[in-house]
């Protein structure tokens, strides 16, 4: 079983959700994790932090989905010098349970470069 936590364009109803997950068997559950969420304009970014960030836990068995998300997020491998986002395994909170899931993080340096706006609510709205 693979798990990823999504907080932006991959959430249900957002632009990349159907593009990546359409036609695949997935389970979606509201969830949250710790980080710091920013609006970069057309999409969000999360950095390491202590704020609550709200999104969805997506669970699936097909490893092709993870490859598709990696490609979308510009993740080429752990600590690869040309990564856009880094993928890390973190605790994600779902109801009363805690599970490990992959989350895509952007560096603080990149967020500053794109003049990211901190979203103190921990929620990115696709608007």
Regions inferred by a protein language model and the residue ranges of each:
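Glycine-aromatic micro-motifs
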Residues: 1-127
């Amino acid at each position: 079983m693979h798990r990823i936590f999504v907080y932006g364009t991959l959430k249900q109803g957002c632009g990349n959700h159907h593009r990546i997950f359409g036609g695949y068997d997935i389970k979606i559950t509201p969830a949250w994790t710790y980080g710091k969420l920013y609006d970069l304009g057309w999409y969000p970014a999360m950095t390491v932090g202590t704020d609550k960030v709200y999104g969805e836990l997506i669970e699936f068995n097909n490893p092709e989905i993870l490859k598709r998300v990696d490609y979308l997020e510009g993740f080429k491998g752990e600590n690869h010098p040309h990564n856009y986002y880094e993928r890390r395994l973190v605790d994600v909170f779902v109801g009363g349970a805690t599970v490990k899931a992959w989350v895509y993080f952007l560096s603080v340096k990149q967020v500053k470069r794109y003049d990211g706006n901190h979203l103190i609510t921990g929620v990115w709205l696709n608007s």
